[in-house]
Amino acid sequence: MDGTPSSGPPRVEAPHLLAPLQTHSQLVALTPQFKSQQSQPQSQSQYPSLINPDSYSSSSPYRLDCGAGIGQGIEDGEDYDQEESNCVTNPEPQPEHQHQYLPQLLDLVADNLEQALIVPRIHQHPQSNNCNSPESFHMMNQSHHQQSEMYYPQYPTQQYNPYPYPTNGAHAPAVSTPMPGPQNVLPVPSALSNQGAMPQAAYSNNAPAGNFDTTGQHNPPGMKPRVTATLWEDEGSLCFQVEARGICVARREDNHMINGTKLLNVAGMTRGRRDGILKSEKVRHVVKIGPMHLKGVWIPYDRALDFANKEKITELLYPLFVHNIGALLYHPSNSNRTSQVMAAAERKKNEAIVGNRSLPSLVQSHHQMMPAMPTGYTSQQPLTNGHQSMANTPQPLTNGSQPPMNGSQTPMNGPQPPMQNGGSMLKRVREDDDDLHRSGPNGHDPMNNIHGMPNGYPHQSPLGSVHQPPMQNGNDGGLKRGREEHDDMHRAGPNGHDPMNNMPGGMPSLPNYAPPPLQNLHQPLSNGDSGMLKRGRDDDDDVHRSSPNGHDANGNFELKRRKTETSTSNDMLPQSPYYTLSNGAYQGPMMNSMNHYKRRDDEAETPRPGPNMNDLNNFDLKQRHKTMESSVPAPQYDAMNRPHSSIGNSPAYASAPTGYDHLTRPASTVAVSPSYPAGPGYELARPVTNVPRRQQSFG
């Protein structure tokens, strides 16, 4: 009997076999003995671990795999030929429980010979390796103990659903308990919850999921509330943030206003419509400065809820509109992070308050510490501090220009030049206090103690200005005495002594000697640079020159030399008192040779009067008048030693001597030169009409 297997129950093609089966179907089904025997093997077949192992052959270890493969393949609707390959070729004995009801079944259908032949064939199939009957596979599909159930379809399929080995694509047993839906009880918060949503019954109030929530208090099915908080420092408020469609919508904690701009952006509204709606709001707060998610137009809570309901985004923005939104933030699952955020917010507030209160005290303490700083680093300290600090520690600013008391005549603080140490900024500040420190003990120069020569100060006549850099001390000591009558400040007293006299070979000093005050320590240039020479040409009544420490060494030398030459007929070098110190050190040649080059360089740097005679105002007329008081003839001077100011106004230049043609003369002498009278004749040689306008201007 060949049959075509299919997914449904296989058909029996022999019509003479169907009739007897149909006549005895109810008899077999309603027999109590058959039912009791059917249920007993079923319970045993469901649990193969309870099967007696003695019924299996020890030589066939593949019995379970083959049985499972046969039952599995029939359940899945596979044809017999395909499943036959899964069976073990070695025959093996079948369990005895599958044949224990065979005698009763044969007695019930003994009137039908064909039925009696079919049933043994089904059970002898594994032993005889005859797999040609599709009916046998369907019988075994129902169960290993039911052979005729294919003819009785009234039995439910639940009796054979659970198979112990659901392999090879078999379906898992059906689960009778349904999947849990949204519950009405607030669950224990857990970060590992596998539910689709974390219901919040405390805020949902058992609202039906099918209706649209217009209050914003109920969580939509399947949505988990996500709230973040940030501290808005500019506004001083905590903001709750809910993200929807990639847009962060914020709500303030203090007044519960909501960022309407971000709210309408979630709705996908165009910019023009959004701005028009927000501009029409009566109560709004425009924020243009701050984080991007906080910028926009903030509107009240009620208006924001109305916009959300109109745009159908209320559920999308959950839990933005929940009244007690802070409770969601304070949920136990977020307690750690929430406490950290709130603690940071409180800490910032406390720091701001404490900072405002402690600010004056910080400023006061800062000012209290200022006097303790060394005067070498604070250039505007009073002179008293400068003298006191100098007594113990040499400072680079206060005594940098004060030379050491040794023969090397080098600046005290090494690489720092006197030009930087003795800045002219301190002149005006310190010269007002000059007289306060001239007669007191604070005016003593502490250098005599530092350099270990306390007895090197001889008693000399008071000097006019003793504020000289290191290289000019020995040279200009006498010259400064010649300028005493022009000093504006009083120099009398022991404090006017030259502090440079304790060089090697110095005379014994008096015990009452008082060195000069600190004002002489601020000479800007040490070696008579061009800048100081130019200032030396300015008159004594200049603001910067009227002070005793404003005179430059080279400038004073030139001015005083010209004044003293009226009574002397010597050469360029003055008398020995001008260049010889009281201790006998003759320093004239060094000073003279040094000033030669300085004055010559300054002549090239000093601006000359231009073609216009008005530029003569650049020179100081009073200085020239003082220079011209002398009647010394011009040939007596050396061109290399005389400044150009004396050349320009010398009376010897009235005839323009030819001995000075190699020098660049000022424009004033060129303008009055007799070699230019031919200029007007040049214009008369041409017709006036043909002369250009620029040439006519010369006439």
From Swiss-Prot:
Which species is this UniProt entry from? Gibberella zeae (strain ATCC MYA-4620 / CBS 123657 / FGSC 9075 / NRRL 31084 / PH-1) (Wheat head blight fungus)
Subcellular localization(s) per the UniProt record: Nucleus
Gene Ontology CC terms, in alphabetical order: nucleus
Its biological purpose is as follows: Transcription factor that regulates asexual reproduction. Binds the StuA-response elements (StRE) with the consensus sequence 5'-(A/T)CGCG(T/A)N(A/C)-3' at the promoters of target genes. Controls the expression of the gene clusters involved in the production of deoxynivalenol (DON) and 15-acetyldeoxynivalenol (15ADON). Regulates the expression of genes involved in chitin and glucan metabolism. Also controls catalase activity and cell surface hydrophobicity. Plays an important role in pathogenicity.
Which segments show compositional bias classed as Acidic residues?
75-84
Pfam families on file: KilA-N
Q: Where is this region: Nuclear localization domain?
A: 669-695
Can you supply a Gene Ontology BP term from the record? conidium formation
Q: Which residues bind DNA?
A: 260-281
Compositional bias (Low complexity) = 32-49
Protein's UniProt name: Cell pattern formation-associated protein StuA
Instruction: Quote the biased-composition stretches of kind Polar residues, using this chain's numbering.
Output: 52-61, 376-423, 520-529, 566-594
Compositional bias of kind Basic and acidic residues: 428-438, 478-491, 535-545
